[in-house]
């Protein structure tokens, strides 16, 4: 971590380049990561096993609101989400992004492996399909891999928020 919000985009890009120059395999994943739960951790741990260094991109607060997660989301501000993610041993770098998708980060970092959770499909080519992995076409073009890891059963931030609100 460089500051409370994670690496700046440029510093993260330099770090990724440094790792690549050391012939380390760079893995990239992204998400909101609000109300962290064991399902998030399992995806991150699985992602980390796909390479040597794991970069996690976190949606900014503004991005989360635009993604229609609800007017009261995220629960935790981006600085808290980034710091919590950076504390995991399996995570090597965290960067917050303000766009609706991480496509520009994927294109800038050029990871060797792009990882998403099991609600996505690695071979989905239709960018309008909710199962489409953003950046997958690019990663495959430069010879990288797209990996989808199984989700932990019964783990959902949205369901947890609903449960809390209804109790």
Regions found by a protein language model. Give the residues of each.
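Nucleotidyltransferase catalytic core that binds NTPs
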Residues: 1-167
């Amino acid at each position: 971590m460089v500051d409370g919000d994670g690496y700046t985009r440029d510093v993260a890009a330099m770090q990724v380049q440094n790792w690549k120059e050391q012939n380390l395999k760079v893995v990239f994943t992204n998400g909101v990561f609000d109300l962290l739960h064991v399902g998030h951790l399992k995806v991150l741990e699985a992602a980390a096993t796909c390479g040597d260094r794991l970069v996690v991109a976190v949606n900014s607060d503004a991005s989360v609101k635009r993604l229609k997660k609800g007017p009261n989301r995220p629960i935790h501000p981006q600085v808290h989400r980034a710091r919590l993610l950076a504390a995991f041993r399996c995570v090597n770098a965290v960067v917050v992004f303000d766009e609706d998708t991480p496509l520009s980060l994927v294109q800038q970092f050029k990871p060797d492996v792009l990882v998403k959770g099991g609600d996505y499909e690695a071979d989905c080519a239709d960018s309008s399909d909710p199962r489409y992995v953003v950046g997958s076409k690019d990663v495959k073009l430069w010879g990288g891999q797209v990996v989808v890891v199984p989700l932990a059963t019964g783990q959902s931030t949205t369901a947890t928020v609903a449960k809390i609100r209804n109790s």
